[in-house]
UniProtKB/Swiss-Prot annotation:
Keywords: DNA recombination, DNA-binding, Transcription, Transcription regulation, Translation regulation. InterPro entries: Hist_DNA-bd, IHF-like_DNA-bd_dom_sf, IHF_beta. This is Integration host factor subunit beta. The gene is ihfB. Belongs to the bacterial histone-like protein family. It comes from Nitrosomonas europaea (strain ATCC 19718 / CIP 103999 / KCTC 2705 / NBRC 14298). One of its GO terms (cellular component) is chromosome. HAMAP family: IHF_beta. PANTHER family: DNA-BINDING PROTEIN HU, INTEGRATION HOST FACTOR SUBUNIT BETA.
Length: 105
């Protein structure tokens, strides 16, 4: 699902919400999440999952085209861990998803 598909689903689910307002809501949520992660904060959405940062130390990499060794600096990368309810939903298979789509709209 893309950001635009999420905005469309949100606007469909809540007809009183204009598409531009749905877009603003999604943008505000994603911006808040990105800012929290950039401050090193953990994000937890119960039933959905959690986002945190994993540290990657500096290392010597290789340019795949030339074979030349290059220094790759240390960095933090975002990491998502699915929550229990999300894992159960995924494990239930596509058949169950179709039932949930009918129920949730």
């Amino acid at each position: 699902m893309t950001k635009s598909e999420l905005i469309s689903k949100l606007a469909e689910r809540f007809p009183q919400l204009l598409a531009k307002d749905a877009e603003l809501v999604v943008k505000i949520i994603l911006d808040a999440m990105a800012k929290s992660l950039s401050r090193g904060e953990r994000i937890e959405i119960r039933g959905f999952g959690s986002f945190d940062l994993n540290y990657r130390p500096s290392r010597v990499g290789r340019n795949p085209k030339s074979g030349e060794k290059v220094h790759v600096p240390e960095k933090y990368v975002p990491h998502f861990k699915a929550g229990k309810k999300m894992r159960e939903l995924i494990d239930s298979g596509p058949k169950q998803h179709k039932v949930l789509d009918r129920v949730t709209g």
